[in-house]
């Protein structure tokens, strides 16, 4: 005897099965987190003196020290007690010498999150999305969670619900306020505190460039720095784009995304074998991208944050790959308007297509000599990089005043915060 299950019932049973499996997975993950917490001390993270931390800063990777160092420097200048916590054992922050700001390694992965989930701090600053969505949970001991951007583009391009459980988000452009308010309205979220504070890492990059002086070289240096994945330039164009650049007579600098060295190792190894280092080609894997950006005349990339650093800080043209962009998993999926990034890129650069490859030399010269691109860079800079040169100081003052307001005894007057409200 055969049993028949109609499609509707089958679908329902399948949904129930998936739900049960998901519940078991999340329950198991919760047990692992608790076990990890016990194994790594089983205590709430407090300051080294044992008190509640006034200002805590968390970085999930050493690459974000360029975002936090300017802020830590400003907190140090003000004599504000703060603790910087990193999930990278080789974070440059651990070598910093401060009197008032403490830096420490709190473990990697779940070990770090287990400690953060028991954090005792008044204000917590981070650039990591996904708070209270993935392993990192809001501490049961409270705290005011503040997110700072690490790229000059749309904050709604984080994975869905990326910033939902932060109390405040520090932004770099007015358009971002409109995006986030629209997102809150669409999803029925309570309005969070949005403040225009700029981009500390880009301010620091600009100051470094000003102090570095002029760099000169012969010919054209073309930097090819794609992101990784199936829509990345190397995946879409392969060796053909490198051949085209060499045929145009340029010096080509190839800088793969760090993730490519792991996820696309076979492809990168094949390209390195086909195009070894020479007087015409160089592969660049520097941790710090400042020098390679400074000595490049033009950048070819895709939807990577480096496009805006190169264009807006170094004031140079870009060519961006015209590849697909799926908003399905992102907060941007909820919005009706086009992302700001896609309105900015056509103004500051040229959209690369396969038809451009035979004439890539002409495209490069056009981008380098057309004054319209330079004018557009100034416009885009004003749109997405406010408070230039002041960001770290503004953020430090904001954190100090926020901590004071949260801990002020009832009935006591509070000092007015910095005038950067949304």
Task: Locate each region found by the language model.
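Conserved catalytic-core segment of nucleotide-activated headgroup transferases in glycan assembly
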Residues: 63-79, 200-271, 350, 354-357, ...
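C-terminal alpha-helical cap of glycosyltransferases
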Residues: 388-422
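Donor nucleotide-activated moiety binding/catalytic core segment of transferases
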Residues: 266-308, 313
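N-terminal signal-anchor transmembrane helix
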Residues: 37-53
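Catalytic donor nucleotide-activated moiety binding site of glycosyltransferases and closely related
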Residues: 86-100, 247-283
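Short, strongly hydrophobic alpha-helical membrane anchors
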Residues: 1-8
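Catalytic binding pocket for nucleotide-activated donors in carbohydrate/polymer assembly enzymes
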Residues: 191, 305-383
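Active-site and donor-binding regions of nucleotide-sugar-utilizing enzymes
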Residues: 54-206
């Amino acid at each position: 005897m055969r049993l028949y299950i109609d499609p509707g019932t089958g679908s329902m049973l399948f949904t129930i099965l998936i739900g049960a499996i998901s519940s078991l997975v999340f329950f198991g993950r919760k047990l692992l987190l608790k076990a990890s917490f016990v194994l790594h001390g089983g205590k709430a993270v407090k300051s080294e003196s044992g008190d509640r931390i006034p200002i805590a800063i968390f970085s999930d990777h050493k690459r974000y020290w360029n975002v936090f160092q300017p802020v830590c420097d400003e907190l140090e200048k003000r004599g504000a007690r703060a603790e910087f916590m990193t999930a990278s054992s080789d974070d440059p922050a651990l070598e910093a010498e401060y009197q008032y700001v403490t830096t420490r390694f709190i473990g990697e992965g779940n070990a770090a999150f287990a400690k953060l989930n028991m954090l005792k701090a008044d204000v917590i600053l981070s650039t990591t999305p996904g708070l209270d969505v993935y392993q990192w949970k809001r501490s049961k001991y409270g705290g005011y969670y503040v997110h700072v951007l690490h790229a000059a583009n749309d904050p709604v391009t984080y994975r869905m619900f990326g910033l939902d459980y932060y109390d405040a988000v520090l932004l770099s452009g007015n358009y971002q306020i409109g995006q986030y308010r629209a997102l809150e309205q669409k999803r029925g979220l309570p309005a969070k505190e949005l403040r225009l504070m700029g981009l500390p890492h880009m301010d620091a990059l600009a100051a470094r460039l000003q102090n570095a002086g002029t760099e000169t070289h012969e010919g054209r240096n073309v930097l090819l720095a794609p992101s990784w994945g199936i829509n990345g330039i190397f995946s879409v164009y392969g060796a053909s784009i490198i051949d085209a650049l060499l045929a145009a007579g340029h010096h080509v600098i190839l800088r793969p995304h760090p993730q490519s060295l792991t996820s696309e190792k076979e492809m990168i190894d094949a390209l390195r074998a086909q195009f070894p280092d020479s007087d015409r080609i160089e592969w660049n894997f520097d941790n710090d991208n400042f020098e390679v950006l400074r000595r490049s005349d033009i950048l070819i990339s895709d939807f990577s944050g480096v496009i805006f650093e190169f264009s807006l800080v170094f004031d140079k043209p870009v060519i961006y790959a015209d590849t697909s962009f799926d908003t399905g998993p992102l907060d941007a999926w909820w919005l009706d308007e086009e992302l700001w990034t896609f309105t900015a890129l056509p103004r500051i650069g040229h959209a690369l297509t396969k038809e451009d490859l035979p004439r890539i030399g002409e495209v490069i010269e056009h981008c380098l000599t057309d004054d319209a691109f330079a004018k557009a860079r100034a416009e885009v800079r004003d749109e997405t990089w406010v408070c230039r040169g002041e960001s770290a100081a503004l953020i430090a003052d904001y954190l100090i005043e926020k901590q004071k307001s949260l801990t002020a005894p009832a009935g006591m007057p509070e000092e007015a915060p910095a005038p950067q409200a949304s």
